[in-house]
Amino acid sequence: MSQSHFFAHLSRLKLINRWPLMRNVRTENVSEHSLQVAMVAHALAAIKNRKFGGQVNAERIALLAMYHDASEVLTGDLPTPVKYFNSQIAQEYKAIEKIAQQKLVDMVPDELRDIFEPLIDEHHYSEEEQSIVKQADALCAYLKCLEELSAGNNEFLLAKGRLEKTLASRRSAEMDYFMQVFVPSFQLSLDEISQDSPL
């Protein structure tokens, strides 16, 4: 039985910091971001199914979101303004991501590859699955901006405005629900979110 470096690589996602060009009150790494995106994507899928007649697999969407940035362990986290500076750079970066995704898939033992390839290679995502993961990814970036701004870090003011436009372009009923029910709490202190539920 040959060894695989797959999970050793994924473990290093925690070493890759997001928002590398910006001053952060609290640094966020790709590993913790991926977990939050997985939780939010699962919630969006569950809301879609329960409230708006959707029929998506919420558990699969959570897994897709968990692995959505896995290729960054090989490429690093390129800052968004650089990644989307123009269409040519965006297209080339997509090609690099695809190569990195395939390299990760190739690390998985043959007998497990059919399980992990559909999670890592985004070409296996349906349009609806991809849409929900992208919504969750943008929402989590927006939540990071709210947290930084609440801590007095105005460095994230323009990013918040840019993400509001992104969220508007990806708007859905389930996102509106999430924004109304869950997002306001992210601007409150621990005391404020704890006062209704004493231990």
Swiss-Prot record:
PANTHER family: 5'-DEOXYNUCLEOTIDASE HDDC2. A divalent metal cation binds at H33, H68, D69, D137. Catalyzes the strictly specific dephosphorylation of 2'-deoxyribonucleoside 5'-monophosphates. The keyword Aminoacyl-tRNA synthetase does not apply. It is found in: Cytoplasm. Gene3D superfamilies: Hypothetical protein af1432. This is 5'-deoxynucleotidase KPN78578_26370. The keyword Metal-binding applies. It comes from Klebsiella pneumoniae subsp. pneumoniae (strain ATCC 700721 / MGH 78578). Residues 30-142 form the HD domain. CDD domains: HDc. GO terms for molecular function: 5'-deoxynucleotidase activity; metal ion binding; nucleotide binding. Its main location: cytoplasm. Keywords: Cytoplasm, Hydrolase, Metal-binding, Nucleotide-binding. Belongs to the 5DNU family. SUPFAM superfamilies: HD-domain/PDEase-like (SSF109604). Homodimer. GO terms for cellular component: cytoplasm. It is an enzyme of class 3 (hydrolase). InterPro entries: HD/PDEase_dom, HD_domain, YfbR, YfbR/HDDC2. It comes from the Bacteria. It catalyses: a 2'-deoxyribonucleoside 5'-phosphate + H2O = a 2'-deoxyribonucleoside + phosphate. Its EC number is 3.1.3.89. Substrate binds at R18, W19, H33, D69, D77, L78, P79, T80, D137.
